[in-house]
Amino acid sequence: MMFRLTSVSCFLLVIACLNLFQVVLTRRCFPPGVYCTRHLPCCRGRCCSGWCRPRCFPRYGKRATFQ
């Protein structure tokens, strides 16, 4: 009986540890200068054009001119 109780306890402990690792790994974030997406967030700053940056700068390019 003691062996069965110990093996069940170990099995439940393994399941609890796997759930904990899953939460830790899925909630990770990336430092500035690393590739990011909407599903892979940045730790600090924002995801600008696919890269973690402290702040996003406006994109320069062709703009409409008003007269």
Swiss-Prot record:
Belongs to the conotoxin I2 superfamily. Expressed by the venom duct. Residues 1-26 form the signal peptide. Residues 64-67 form a propeptide. It is found in: Secreted. Disulfide bonds join C29-C43, C36-C48, C42-C52, C47-C56. The cysteine framework is XI (C-C-CC-CC-C-C). This is Conotoxin Cp1.1. InterPro entries: Conotoxin-I_CS (IPR013141), Conotoxin_I2 (IPR020242). GO terms for molecular function: toxin activity. The modification Tyrosine amide is found at Y60. GO terms for cellular component: extracellular region. It comes from Conus capitaneus. The keyword Signal applies. Keywords: Amidation, Cleavage on pair of basic residues, Disulfide bond, Secreted, Signal, Toxin. The keyword Nucleus does not apply.
